A protein has these predicted regions:
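Conserved class I S-adenosyl-L-methionine
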Residues: 135-158
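Conserved alpha-helix/loop element of class I SAM-dependent methyltransferases that forms part
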Residues: 21-40
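Short alpha-helix
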Residues: 163-179
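A short glycine-rich, Lys/Arg-flanked "PGG" loop and its adjoining helix->strand segment in the class I
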Residues: 118-130
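A conserved beta-strand element that flanks and buttresses the S-adenosyl-L-methionine
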Residues: 106
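N-terminal, positively charged/glycine-rich alpha-helical extensions of SAM-dependent methyltransferases
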Residues: 1-13
Length: 209
């Protein structure tokens, strides 16, 4: 945990610049997320500098956006102009919220960079309402081109905390194996394939975009 926070603390100031290359994929992702969070109470874990939260907050009732990195949260707070958006430092494995507090939980590009992602999903399940939605877009590095795999290798050498390399299919299977019904999924073109997933606690048919 401390190694992970150290990496993100050190790179918080350059995170937004690093993510600009994937702006088109993120804009598409925002389009998918906004209808889901409309008039809902939302928790985001691993918010980073708040790129997603700031882009969708107008649709939501309120967003609690959290990250384990204090420096990331400092960056996120700098240009927060919404009274509906609150940033705080939290551990996604030990969230301070009561059971079934949120209608939507967003965990974007988080599950592949933490050890024991299944435990993070358990904590998300605890704070999500029974009829709530988990939105969990994740870079699926294993389903990548040769150049992309080389890029992932050099990121790993630079200290990027990549713990799980999934293909899109493997990632969706991982979600299902941990008690989530994937209601909608799509693979967005980015630096690495970005697998978008909307999940519920209940069983239901999968819809692939």
């Amino acid at each position: 945990m401390h190694e992970r926070k150290g990496f993100w603390d050190k790179n918080a100031g350059r995170y937004d610049r690093f993510m600009r290359k994937d702006q088109a994929a993120y804009e598409k992702m925002y389009e998918l997320i906004r209808p889901v969070v409309k008039a809902k109470t939302v928790l985001e874990v691993a918010t980073g500098t708040g790129l997603i939260a700031k882009s969708i907050v107008d649709a939501a009732v309120h967003i609690e956006a959290t990250d384990a990195s204090a420096q990331m949260i400092l960056e996120a707070k700098r240009d927060n102009q919404s009274a509906k958006l609150h940033f705080s430092v939290q551990d996604m494995f030990r969230l301070p919220y009561a059971q079934k507090s949120f209608e939507v939980v967003i965990a974007s590009n988080a599950l592949h960079i933490v050890p024991h992602p299944e435990k993070a999903l358990q904590e998300i399940r605890r704070v999500l309402k029974d009829d709530g939605v988990l939105i969990a877009p994740t870079f699926t590095h294993a389903g990548n081109s040769v150049s992309g795999k080389a890029k992932a290798f050099f990121m790993s050498m630079a200290g990027f905390p990549l713990h799980s390399r999934w293909t899109s299919e493997e990632y969706l299977r991982f979600l299902r194996q941990n008690g989530w019904a994937v209601q909608k999924s799509a693979v967005l073109k980015a630096s690495f394939p970005l697998t978008y997933a909307e999940c519920t606690k209940s069983e239901g048919p999968d819809v692939v975009l």
